[in-house]
Amino acid sequence: TINGKPQSELDLTDLSFEVGTVLQDPDSQFVGLTVAEDVAFALENDAQKVDVLHRKVAEWADRLNLKALLNKHPQDLSGGQKQRVALAGVLIDNEPMLLLDEPLANLDPAAGRASMKLLDWLVSQQDLPVIIIDHRIEEVLQIPIDRMVIRADGRVAADDTPEQILKQNILLKNGLREPLYVTALKAAGIDIRAVERLDDLAGLNLTTDQQAQLTSWVANLPQPKETKKADPIISLRGLTFAYPDEEKIFDKFDLTIHRGEMAALVGRNGTGKTTLINLITGFLKPTSGRLLFGDTDISTDSVKQRADRIGYVLQDPNQMISKTMIFDEVALGLELRGVDSETTKKRVFDTLKITGLYPYRNWPISALSFGQKKRVTIAAALVLRPEVLILDEPTAGQDLAHYAQMMDFLVALNRQQGTTVLMVTHDMNLMMAYADRTIVLDQGRVLEDAAPAKVLTNQAVIAKAHLG
């Protein structure tokens, strides 16, 4: 039952009045031409008066930090901003229950924390039941969670308090990533069953002996070694860019990516990460400045020309796929470049073997999992033999098993094939575990450029860039 009503007796329209839903992909929820129109849409359908519309839109825009965005097109916003607009559009109609599918997937750590605090406020002050579906368990646990339900193989594998779930190692057993601090406690030799308030990092209650164990473990961790940087492969020199009728996002911006690096590009939502990638790949053109690939100026190269050197994989593979069959999708780029069929077949098969997709070469893409589709889009980029691969949120929305498979594949690609990898991510765990360099972007400039450990021990950078 839902709110005491048998679900079998409720159609989709009825359900929409009982449960407000925020989808993982906010673009699929937008109906208004501006943020204000989109947030107000439900109230317009309810035939609310204009003054009520204005008051409630202003109220939720203030709560979700959307005031400066009300006149913008939803499609022009960053992923995190889109998420907040979708949330406001649901909350404004006073639904009796709220369901969120991967609400943290597109948010930087600080925005995610703010989102969780808002949900906590809705539960505690508005008495609104909230159901959260998410893989980013550590961030979800930033607020009090009453109950955690783990599903596996079509059944309920666990239904308990978060603290008991963590103490019983249920997450790892069911392919979910446990909070990093729990992993650290285990590595230090601490019996997590004896730790009080294990589900609350801020209130974690360690005994004196447990604190000593943890301190000793941290002190004995191996220190990362400085490595000599290779030659530049991508160099941005004096890059300036602004969207029409807006202030400059980049003003005489400089950045160098070195050959063979596995780098992470991080920063708060809306700080220019996606814009920067679009400038590198050619989807946007700078007002001034130069883009070098090695020693070659590629500033005037087309998107197609740059794709031969720089592969780009979007966060959502469904936005990139244009063919029905796996082979056809991976072969498309070669066919558009006039490569003969025999060469195309060989290069596609070689690429499918590298990406672990060769057994599925004759499969329809619709039969694949999200993670496998992601690999197809990577294969479609790799078949052109680019020297650089740029990925937007490579592991977003994936469980631990698919997360590990994807990252192991990228590491092998980097180490064995020599491919330079640039990952745009909000996942600090991913950055710490896999990147050898972190570039922190803030308001169109490089705030920090250092090893991941150095970035995450700089409190000023963490606060300014919303990394924690």
Where are the predicted features?
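Conserved ABC transporter NBD signature motif
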Residues: 1-6, 15, 289-297
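Conserved ABC ATPase signature
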Residues: 73-77, 81, 364-368
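Catalytic Walker B motif of ABC-type/P-loop ATPase nucleotide-binding domains
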Residues: 98-101, 389-392
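Conserved beta-strand-loop-alpha-helix hinge in the C-terminal portion
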Residues: 155-181, 445-467
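Helix-to-loop junction immediately C-terminal to a conserved catalytic motif
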Residues: 281
